């Protein structure tokens, strides 16, 4: 019995390994927030376990007027639908900002669309956030598709 369970675990791990891929990429967004210009860069790296699930980590840099902030962002991406060229995803993420006293954290879900250029390259767009954010010492709902909530970028798979 132990041998059968061990063989099954080896087979499952091999199948996961065959479909798994590392990726790097990043995006950018810009817009106006309360009469202030905002620009942000979002580099990221991650690991695709299979056709449906990926996890990753992002480091971001945001500039609002003359203030510069940084953040870290672990995320998990789930592919809801695809046709081998277009992918509709939902990304669960938690963003932790540093360099700001007013805004500390943001958690929630982001809808995303990816377009496959070839086996290595994809372009993507993330739109908005559905969740909560910690602002000024309080948690409040976060919902929106404003210009600063739309990110476009590229992904490269190894």
Which residues fall in each region the model found?
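Gram-negative (and chloroplast) outer-membrane scaffold detector with strong preference
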Residues: 30, 44-123, 155-158
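Surface-exposed strand-loop-strand hairpins of Gram-negative outer-membrane beta-barrel proteins
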Residues: 32-41, 137-141
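Transmembrane beta-strand segments of Gram-negative outer membrane beta-barrel proteins
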Residues: 20-32
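Sec-dependent N-terminal signal peptides
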Residues: 4-14
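Sec/Tat signal peptide C-region and signal peptidase I cleavage site
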Residues: 14-20
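Membrane-helix boundary connector in multi-pass membrane proteins
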Residues: 115, 132-138
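Residues that define the transmembrane beta-barrel architecture of outer-membrane proteins
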Residues: 22, 37-41, 68-72, 103-107, ...
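Outer-membrane beta-barrel "beta-signal"
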Residues: 23, 115, 144-158
């Amino acid at each position: 019995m132990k041998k059968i369970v061990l063989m099954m675990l080896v087979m499952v791990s091999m199948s996961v390994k065959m479909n798994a891929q590392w990726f790097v990429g990043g995006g950018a967004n810009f817009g106006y927030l309360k009469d202030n210009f905002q620009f942000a860069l979002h580099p990221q790296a991650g690991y695709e376990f299979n056709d449906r699930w990926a996890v990753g980590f992002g480091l971001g840099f945001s500039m609002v007027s003359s203030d510069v902030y940084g953040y870290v962002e672990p995320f998990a991406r789930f592919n809801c639908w695809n046709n081998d060229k277009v992918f509709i995803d939902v990304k669960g993420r938690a963003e932790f900002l540093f360099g700001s006293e007013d805004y500390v954290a943001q958690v929630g879900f982001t809808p995303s669309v990816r377009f496959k250029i070839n086996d290595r390259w994809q372009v993507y767009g993330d739109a908005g956030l559905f969740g909560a954010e910690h602002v000024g010492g309080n948690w409040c709902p976060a919902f929106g598709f404003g210009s600063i909530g739309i990110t476009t970028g590229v992904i490269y798979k190894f």
